[in-house]
Amino acid sequence: MNKLSFTLMLLFFCQSIFAVNGVPGPRDCFWSRGPHSGDPYINLAYPDSNVFYWAATFSMPDGAELNIKGDFPYARYMSIISYDGQGRPIESLADYLIEPNKKAVNPFSNGNSRLDQERGYEIKVLNKAPTDKRVTGRIASTKSNNVLHAPAYGPNQQTIIYRIYLPDRGTAPLGNVKLPDIKVNFEGKTLDKDQSCKLLKSSQSLAISLDAAGIAPMEYRKLASQPDKPVTWPAKNPPEWYIQLDRQSLIGIYTGEFNNDAPRSTGGFFPNLDNHYLRTIVNRKYGNVLILRGKAPNTPNTFNGDPKYIENELRYWSVCSNQSFGNTRVNDCLYDEEIPLDENGFFTLAISKSEHRPRNAIDDCGIAWLPIAENGDGVFDDDVAIVQFRHMLARDNFPNSIQSVENQGDIKAV
């Protein structure tokens, strides 16, 4: 495939990252892009297959006030996060930062009922940059005042993404609530949803940079097939792990050039500021099956409609098999509650193509399994996959979180 074809393919990906044609699921004139997850419709920018995503792209006129009103979902987590034109996060307004309406309950506050029917909230979106940066990946002590900062980029465009992680059993994708509603106050009038969408131009095309959703396939192929590197590059056996920093450090997996001063999760691909990520590249040329074993962090139990939210070491963790930085597709993910653990809290995970799945890689034998795609990285190497762990909202006193890794050199110690 020539360079022009690769460029056109990435352009198509960027324009279709939040496309909706033919995608089943709820949406409206504002939340018009989604829902997407680890599905065949819109599988891009490393989605977690246990999460549902909706995006809104809009432009607030000067003097307009945008309010979003909704109900907290029956789920593990929800947030609304703003992004720039390169797919980098600006601010996360996570569930626990949102004050509920009067007489309502926030089901994501420690010790609160998860099942209370009065669970409404209302937030305000501002077209300006935040003056203070909240801590990422951990529970912030600062208040949000129910405000999300979503500054415009490029052609006066703003983008926010609404996430619902792990809806309770039988409630997907929205967690047994409706999509958040919007209203705009403008020039002394309060506009309804349809009027607001028209004013905000919420049907406009997405105007993001070509590399916001992934590394250009031509560049990816060049990085992964350097003439002075082995054919397995950059995979190693045993695997070498990398935290997510900026785009330079992502490419550093292939070049060795890391920016340890970079803030976390600033490399694009629309990451969640409440997660920190750890990943490795694997290659089947070392063997058909990769076995990983580790101690599982403790998280709240929610999937089976548990009545009370009890804070734990992490809010959520998962492990995913992805194709590559060249197409950013997810093969599948496993979330904390579904991963079998032994009596000491350790998990064992096998990763392989389906034809080489070990016969004992089933829950009854205590071994989890994730697939490698039949076409590998989806670009040129059928043997490649990315394995990625997510740790969400770690407690400060939990020393073994990905959040505790300050730089690449600390990974083994943590």
Q: PLM ranges: what are they?
A:
Residues 2-9:
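Sec-dependent signal peptide recognition
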Residues 14-16:
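N-terminal signal peptide c-region/cleavage motif recognized by signal peptidases
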Residues 20-414:
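A compositional/structural signature for long, glycine/proline-rich flexible linkers
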